[in-house]
Every structure is written in C-alpha cells, then in structure tokens.
C-alpha cells in the first residue's frame, strides 16, 4: 500500500525501464501522484483511495497496469511483493485478500511468459499482520511456482 518512492527515484531517468506502483493515496510517504510520470514517461503511478477492495483494485489493474505492461513488453519483471494491502493489515486501509494477490501474480506471470520467457524476480517488501502476510505470500508463491 505504500508508494515505491525509492524504486521510482532509481528508475526516474531510465527510459529502458517501466516502474509501476499501485498504492493507497494519501498515505506515507506522500509520493506517487498520477502526475509523477518519469523523465521518459516510464513511471506509472496508480493511487487508490483508502478502503480499496479487490473489485476496485482489479478494475484499476485491468484498466491501467496491464495494458501499460503489455505495451512495454518487459524482458524481465521485478516484483516488489508487499502484502500490507491485505484487509487484516494494521498499517493501512486496503481490503485485499490472498485471492487478489494470486490474481495479480497470475496476470504478471502471463505477461512475463509472453514477453520475457517467464523471467520474474519477486522480493518480499511488507505485510504487518502475520496471518494476512503468510496467506498472501503463500498464494503469491504458489502462482509463481505454477501450483
């Protein structure tokens, strides 16, 4: 749920990368407005309001994220896998469940298979409710593993 401000800063000037962030707005660190697009229009920020549930999240991903990723045709996907958007997480106000994380992971795997021979690196970022984190991470890894 937190904007990836550090990652955005790293890739801000790199036209060979596409940085995408879906995050709660407003929320710490206060970055990630839709108008923040990078020097080469290589940044896509999708700020979502508090209370965003799986239906709204999936609609935003379908409308904004997936078409942009398809157009970019990444040779490698790097996933900052944060699970603090889970409904049980105490630090923010999203209402995603583990099935939502499995859903987005499946879409990212499909894009990686079409454009990057399936190459994905996934890094655990956050999640502060241990039950929500463990269930979400398991759902994510199961999809990555093809289970």
Please provide the spans of the model-predicted regions.
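A general "terminal functional-core" signal
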Residues: 1-147
